[in-house]
Amino acid sequence: MYIGFGYDAHRLKKGRELILGGVKILTSEGLDGHSDADVLIHALMDALLGAAGLNDIGHFFPDMDPKYKNVSSISLLESVYKELKKQNFSVNNVDITVIVEAPKICPFIADMKENISRVIELKRERIGIKATTNEKMGFVGRGEGIAAVAVASISQEKKR
């Protein structure tokens, strides 16, 4: 069994869609980034890649590459999962915390779990998604951005 940790943060920007866990959340600000800036999925991808001993998402999906401009992070997660499968890895469980003052994401967690479950072939019961605030401290507390942390556990089947 291997364990990986991931972190991501993005600034909020007016006029951008807010996408977390592959779910569009209606709000006046979204996350600014080269892709759709889904911090939840970005943290998860880095946790999975780290557990497998691979490079981070910046290596696989450089933000200077125009083909990743506004790309769906769910599609990037599909690519990460394919890379893991090539090396005979399977995912045991994932646990993700989103640090956000607003909006409240609780109503969207079931859909986020469904999106992740579908892509990484993991039962929803093995996917933890939680949210917390930063108690008005720091860039998240001031409403300037959103951050996420993730832990992933994976196993590797031995080749015969």
UniProtKB/Swiss-Prot annotation:
Keywords: Isoprene biosynthesis, Lyase, Metal-binding. One of its GO terms (biological process) is terpenoid biosynthetic process. It catalyses: 4-CDP-2-C-methyl-D-erythritol 2-phosphate = 2-C-methyl-D-erythritol 2,4-cyclic diphosphate + CMP. It is an enzyme of class 4 (lyase). Binds 1 divalent metal cation per subunit. 4-CDP-2-C-methyl-D-erythritol 2-phosphate binds at residues 8-10, 34-35, 56-58, 61-65, 132-135, 139, 142. The record marks H34, T133 as: Transition state stabilizer. Pfam families: YgbB. Its cofactor is a divalent metal cation. A divalent metal cation binds at D8, H10, H42. Its EC number is 4.6.1.12. Signal peptide: none annotated. Pathway: Isoprenoid biosynthesis; isopentenyl diphosphate biosynthesis via DXP pathway; isopentenyl diphosphate from 1-deoxy-D-xylulose 5-phosphate: step 4/6. Coiled coil: none annotated. It comes from the Bacteria. InterPro entries: MECDP_synthase, MECDP_synthase_CS, MECDP_synthase_sf. GO terms for molecular function: 2-C-methyl-D-erythritol 2,4-cyclodiphosphate synthase activity; metal ion binding. NCBIfam families: ispF (TIGR00151). Belongs to the IspF family. Homotrimer. PANTHER family: 2-C-METHYL-D-ERYTHRITOL 2,4-CYCLODIPHOSPHATE SYNTHASE, CHLOROPLASTIC. Involved in the biosynthesis of isopentenyl diphosphate (IPP) and dimethylallyl diphosphate (DMAPP), two major building blocks of isoprenoid compounds. Catalyzes the conversion of 4-diphosphocytidyl-2-C-methyl-D-erythritol 2-phosphate (CDP-ME2P) to 2-C-methyl-D-erythritol 2,4-cyclodiphosphate (ME-CPP) with a corresponding release of cytidine 5-monophosphate (CMP). This is 2-C-methyl-D-erythritol 2,4-cyclodiphosphate synthase. The gene is ispF.
